[in-house]
Amino acid sequence: MRHDQIPIDVPTAQALIRQQFPHLRSEPIRFLPSTGTVNAIFRVGDLLAARFPLHESDPAELAESLSTEADAMGELAGRSPVPTPTCVGLGRPDKSYPLPFTLQTWIPGHVATPTMVSDSPKFAADLVRFIQALRATDLDGRSFNGRGRGGALPDHDEWMEHCFTRSAGLLDVPRLRWMWAGFRGLPAGGNDTMSHGDLTPANLLVDGGRLAGVLDGGGFAPADPSLDLVAAWHLLGRPARTTFKEGLGSSDVEWQRGAAWAFQQAMGLVWYYQRSNPAMAGLGRSTVERLLDDPEVGAR
């Protein structure tokens, strides 16, 4: 648990939801364990989920951010070929819980793991259709906002140096430094396209081996078109990655940049969550291993 983590339990969540959303008074509420690190999630009846932010933040700024995310979720839901949650309510903080929270529609399915669909060309093809639909969304004059992943790779040098330092004894840091040196020197990405921005296993739902839904759509926004390619190394083995790359028609540069974003994300997971969240640390390790073993990117 982080030092700034805010406790939230079922009785507190139940009281807040029933007080602020009286029409849900009769709905059962239960906590949903997950590997997520940003929100505590509670199931509200059969059709909704409540997401309570876990870390200290300015309530007014967070409310504005959640409102922006709600708009992005609505836009994504209108473009996605698979179900994605929409926000149906914004809860207010009170003395029992100091931050705003959200009510969202519930999407059924099994949360993916790094290996669940690794050998599935059908799942890879589903991801292709999802990303193509996002890329076809009109930017309406928007561009990358400069925050987080999705812009210039060298902007992340300081963070990567921190990760390399903290990963000593956990990973083959000299080899990984060399790998980043190649990634950061890649040509700039193509024109921005609309991107989910965080296609990790925890945000992808599976049913019958197919993509059944995509979660956490609040970051739907313009970015480097290679950003959503991170799913290739977070989830897919080599044959399925080939299906994915060919389906998207990715150029070699776009593919390498996708690998770079997956690498940047994975390097922050292993050391940071080594003790607090083994599943997230494991995702980081498996992604790094896939990148190192990938003949198209690991031998840069």
Report residues per predicted region.
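Short, non-transmembrane alpha-helical segments in secretory-pathway proteins
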Residues: 9-24
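Generic recognition of well-ordered alpha-helical segments
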Residues: 15, 71, 75, 129, ...
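Short glycine/proline-enriched coil/turn segments at helix->beta-strand junctions
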Residues: 45-48, 81, 209, 234-238, ...
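ATP-binding pocket architecture of kinase catalytic cores
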Residues: 2-6, 23, 27-158, 165-171, ...
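Helix-rich C-terminal or lid/interface subdomains of diverse kinases
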Residues: 37, 125, 219-222, 230-300
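Helical cap/lid subdomains and adjacent loops of hydrolase enzymes that gate the active-site channel
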Residues: 146-185, 247, 253-257, 282
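Active-site acidic catalytic loop and adjacent metal/ATP-binding pocket
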Residues: 37-44, 50, 87, 180-229
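Short, surface-exposed alpha-helical segments at coil->helix boundaries
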Residues: 10-14, 70, 238, 242
